[in-house]
C-alpha cells in the first residue's frame, strides 16, 4: 500500500525523497535482537523516520513490536526513537506502559510550544494536545518517573517575540529532561522557504541562545528531583 503519514512542511519532503512507509519485517528484527543479546548487548533502540507508523503497511503496529521485543531473553531495556504526539492514542500509551522493559523516557517531537507557530508549521497538534499526551504518559506510569526530551525550533517564519516567549514557557510547563534547540534553517523545496515574515538570522541565533539557557535550567530542576531516590540502573560502557 502507499502510505504517506507526513503532515508538516519540512516532513512533506521525506516521502518525495524516500517513498512511502516501508516497515521492516518483524521476524528479522527479532532475529537481530537475539543475535545482539547473544553478543552481550542489553539495550536496544527502535528507530525510524516515522516510528509510530511502523506496521501501517503490513497490518501490525509499533506496540506489538515492542511487546515482542521485550520477550527476547537477554534484552533488558528497550528505548524508542522520536515519537509524534498526535499518533499516541490512550490505548497505545496504556500498552506501552505495561511493557516493563521499555525505558520510560520518550522523545516527543514538539518543534514549538506555541500553537500559532505549530499551525504555521502545519503540525496537526496544538501545544495543549501535546501537554495532554505528556499527562497521559505520566498517569499511565503512576509513581514511576517518566522523562521527556524533544526538539524545538527558534525563528520559524512569522514567529513573534510573544510566540517565542510562549514557547519558552511551555518548556518550563512540561519539564523536559533535554531540549535540542536550533534556529530555523531556510530550506529550498519546502513551502516555508517562501513564507513572508522571515526572522532575521541574528534574532534566530539570539532566541536559540535564550531558549538553550531556559532548557538547561529546566534540565537541572528535573535532575534535582532524582536526588535521594533509589532505582535499578543499567551500566553503560
Predicted segments — roles?
Residues 130-140, 144-198:
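N-terminal intrinsically disordered, low-complexity, charge/repeat-rich segments that act as generic
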Residues 2-9:
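Short, small-residue-biased leader/transition segments that mark boundaries at the very start
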Residues 14-17, 52:
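Detector for the c-type heme attachment site
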Residues 29, 62, 130, 164-167, ...:
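Aromatic/hydrophobic pocket-lining residues that form the small-molecule binding cavity
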Residues 194-237:
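Terminal RNA-binding accessory module
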Residues 16-45, 64:
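Conserved alpha-helical substructure of the radical SAM core
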Residues 38-161:
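Conserved SAM/AdoMet-binding glycine-rich loop
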Residues 18-19, 119-125, 194-199:
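Short glycine-enriched, charge-decorated loop/helix-capping segments at active-site entrances
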